[in-house]
Amino acid sequence: MTKSELIERLADKARHVPSRDVELAIKEMLEQMAQTLQKGERIEIRGFGSFSLHYRAPRVGRNPKTGETVELDGKHVPHFKPGKELRERVNEDLIA
């Protein structure tokens, strides 16, 4: 599902809310989440999961085109850990 598909589905469910307002709400929610992670803070949505940053240590990589080894710097990467309810739901029979 893409962001635009999510906006469309939510706008269909909440017909009393203009589609543009749904779009603005989704974009603002994602922006707030990005800013929170950028500050190094954790986001927890009970029943859904949590977002945090994990540190990837510096390592030696390889350029796939040339085969040459390359030093890669350490960096923080976003990490999502699903909550118990979400894990249980995805293990139920999949909806077609």
Curated annotation (Swiss-Prot):
This is Integration host factor subunit beta. It comes from Pseudoalteromonas atlantica (strain T6c / ATCC BAA-1087). The gene is ihfB. Belongs to the bacterial histone-like protein family. Heterodimer of an alpha and a beta chain. GO terms for biological process: DNA recombination; regulation of DNA-templated transcription; regulation of translation. This protein is one of the two subunits of integration host factor, a specific DNA-binding protein that functions in genetic recombination as well as in transcriptional and translational control. The lineage of its organism: Bacteria, Pseudomonadati, Pseudomonadota, Gammaproteobacteria, Alteromonadales. CDD domains: IHF_B. Coiled coil: none annotated. It comes from the Bacteria.
